[in-house]
């Protein structure tokens, strides 16, 4: 997962910070804690880079470091991380309707999740609800996609 520092007005302030917050939340939910070594491994970055970003996230009031517990999200950090995760899940659910390969979905969502506006996300959520409740409509879309292939 590439780390760029492009600004994102919708979340923490940068794509890289979003990725860290999302990863920290994932680790906490999975293991009960988020250690820098685990963050480093999962993001494919050096521990020095992770330490620097954790200091930045701490300065922004998004994380704290607790002895024996590792990195924990502040209430504000958890709120942002949850919004990022929810956005990721909505985009993933939407693309799965169209039988797109999982690795393609993953890479597409990683790019889109940082830049999608709230208005666009709301529209996608509405479409997801319709596709879930109207399978015949989804079948029509899939037929149309098949004709375009």
Labelled PLM ranges:
Residues 16-19, 35, 76, 87, ...:
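N-terminal positioning helix adjacent to the helix-turn-helix/winged-helix DNA-binding module
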Residues 1-12:
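Short, Lys/Arg-enriched N-terminal segment that forms or immediately precedes the first helix
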Residues 11-45:
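N-terminal helix-turn-helix DNA-binding core of bacterial DNA-binding proteins
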Residues 36-67, 75:
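Canonical helix-turn-helix DNA-binding module
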Residues 46, 99-103:
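Helix N-cap / loop-to-helix initiation motif
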Residues 110-149:
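C-terminal regulatory/oligomerization modules of transcriptional regulators
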Residues 42, 80, 97:
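Residues within the alpha-helical elements of helix-turn-helix
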Residues 69-88:
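Basic, amphipathic "hinge/linker" alpha-helix immediately C-terminal to the N-terminal HTH DNA-binding motif
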């Amino acid at each position: 997962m590439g780390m760029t520092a492009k600004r994102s007005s919708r979340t923490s302030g940068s794509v890289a910070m979003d990725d860290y917050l999302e990863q920290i939340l994932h680790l906490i939910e999975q293991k009960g804690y988020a250690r820098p070594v685990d963050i480093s491994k999962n993001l494919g970055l050096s521990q020095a880079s992770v330490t620097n970003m954790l200091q930045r996230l701490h300065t922004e009031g998004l994380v704290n470091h607790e002895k024996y517990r590792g990195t924990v999200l502040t209430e504000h950090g958890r709120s942002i991380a949850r919004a990022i995760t929810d956005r990721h899940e909505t985009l993933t659910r939407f693309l799965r309707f169209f039988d797109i390969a999982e690795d393609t979905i993953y890479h597409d969502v990683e790019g889109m999740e940082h830049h999608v506006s709230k208005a666009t996300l709301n529209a996608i959520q509405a479409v997801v609800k319709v596709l879930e409740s109207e399978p015949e409509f989804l079948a029509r879309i899939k037929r149309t996609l098949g004709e375009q292939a």
